[in-house]
């Protein structure tokens, strides 16, 4: 019983830390930087927990050990957490403007003599609050991703969460573009070899928005409805963000707008970073089946628990509507480290290319089809990946194992 409880509550890591980061913003002072500190703590923990883990598993009757109601309620709960986080940040913008950047009077002594909450916030700590908000609102987006694969109430929650994060196009573009065009030139979310994470961010974000724009244009034309219409899900999605924009503008005018733009910029950078890390450099010939090999998997402990198994990309792309706690490790190519580690590696492009080109060389040798190899050889010449040796990683031997690959549903 205790083991079953631990299997399920381990996925509360991110919600708890999101709430803690939000509390830091509310308290203000040096605590406004708590979210930034927690990001680096996450990196250390990710390094220390490189060991592999599994999903919740099944009992002797073949029934999942996952608590569906508990996990779904947790994901739904993240929407009010999102809203409260934004309200708290807007409050801090308001107090900054009202008191001219002074801390003002002590409102509450949380730990007498050690930790107090001031009425206002300094400019430096407002920067910390903004960065903390961007980081942990971005981390919370993983719940919007998970619910985008559901229908009904769950999808509405996802759509609202993504709209409040400045990424209203995501729910449709992710399901109807990324999951169908994965690792091909028609998928803006897949980063080709040689591209940096900084170059990928705007191209992926705008490319996915363009996809939904075009999809709605064609859909409404077939219906005989004007593009400028409430039925346009591209327009309607971005309008859902208007209350957030109004809130921050009312709180601090253009200072509020700058804070919101920074928060959205960071949170969406994290979202596109996940796309970048999960499929970087992988190649699929258009109209050929999507296979397990078209994903970089990860099943290290902290990444799996914190990011609710999002690292099991191969199984996720095969069974998109499967609950995250039921996803399995299917023996796919692996980047070797957890998401915190590879994210920080990706922030330094020369190190990232050095790190990944060796893994891509192994992928070309052990996983790619002849057609994919031909494309890879051409691209490798163009971006300077040609002739890269590979040694010293389990990926080298992975291609010699029968992975039992299934063709992903399209």
Positions of the model-derived regions?
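C-terminal ends of transmembrane helices
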Residues: 45-60, 142-146
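Cytosolic/stromal cytosol-facing helical appendages immediately following the last transmembrane segment
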Residues: 2-15, 155-232, 266-410
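Alpha-helical bilayer-embedded segments of polytopic membrane proteins, i.e.
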Residues: 2-50, 66-94, 105-136, 229-272, ...
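Hydrophobic side chains within alpha-helical segments
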Residues: 148-149, 244, 275
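Conformational gate/switch positions in structured elements
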Residues: 40-44, 146, 254, 280, ...
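Transmembrane helix-loop junctions in multipass membrane proteins, especially transporters and channels
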Residues: 30, 51-55, 90-98, 146-150, ...
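Juxtamembrane helix-capping/reentrant segments at transmembrane boundaries
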Residues: 57-82, 290-300, 329-335
């Amino acid at each position: 019983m205790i083991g079953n409880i631990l299997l399920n509550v381990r996925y509360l890591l991110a919600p708890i830390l999101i709430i803690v980061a939000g509390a830091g913003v509310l308290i203000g002072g040096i605590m406004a930087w708590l979210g930034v500190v927690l990001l680096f703590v996450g990196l250390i923990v990710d390094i220390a927990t490189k060991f592999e883990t599994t999903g919740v598993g099944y009992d002797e009757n073949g029934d999942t050990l996952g608590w569906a109601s508990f996990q779904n309620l947790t994901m739904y709960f993240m929407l009010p957490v999102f809203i409260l986080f934004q309200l708290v940040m807007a409050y801090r913008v308001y107090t900054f403007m009202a008191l001219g950047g002074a801390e003002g009077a002590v409102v509450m002594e949380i730990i007498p003599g050690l930790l107090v909450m001031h009425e206002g916030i300094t400019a430096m700590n407002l920067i910390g609050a903004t960065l903390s908000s961007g980081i942990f609102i971005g981390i919370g987006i993983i719940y919007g991703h998970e619910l985008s694969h559901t229908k009904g109430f769950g999808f509405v929650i996802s759509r609202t969460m993504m709209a409040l994060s400045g990424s209203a196009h995501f729910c449709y573009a992710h399901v109807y573009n990324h999951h169908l065009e994965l690792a091909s030139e028609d998928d803006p979310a897949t980063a080709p070899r040689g591209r940096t994470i900084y170059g990928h961010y705007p191209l992926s974000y705008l490319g996915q928005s363009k996809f939904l724009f075009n999809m709605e244009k064609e859909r409404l034309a077939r219906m005989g409805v004007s593009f400028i219409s409430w039925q346009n899900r591209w327009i309607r999605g971005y309008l859902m963000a208007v209350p957030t924009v109004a809130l921050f503008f009312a709180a601090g005018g253009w200072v509020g707008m700058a804070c919101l733009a920074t928060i959205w910029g960071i949170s969406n950078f994290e979202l596109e970073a996940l796309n970048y890390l999960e499929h970087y450099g992988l190649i699929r010939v258009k109209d050929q089946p999507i296979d397990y090999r078209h994903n970089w998997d990860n099943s290290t402990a902290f990444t799996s628990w914190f990011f609710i198994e999002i690292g099991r990309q191969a199984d996720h792309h095969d069974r998109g509507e499967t609950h995250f706690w039921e996803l399995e490790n299917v023996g796919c190519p692996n980047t070797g480290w957890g998401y915190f580690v590879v994210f920080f590696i990706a922030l330094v492009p020369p190190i990232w290319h050095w790190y990944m080109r060796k893994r891509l060389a192994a992928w070309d040798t052990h996983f790619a089809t002849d057609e994919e190899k031909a494309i890879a050889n051409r691209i490798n010449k163009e971006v300077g990946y040609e002739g890269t040796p590979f040694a010293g990683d389990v990926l080298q031997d992975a291609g010699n194992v029968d992975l039992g690959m299934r063709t992903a549903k399209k």
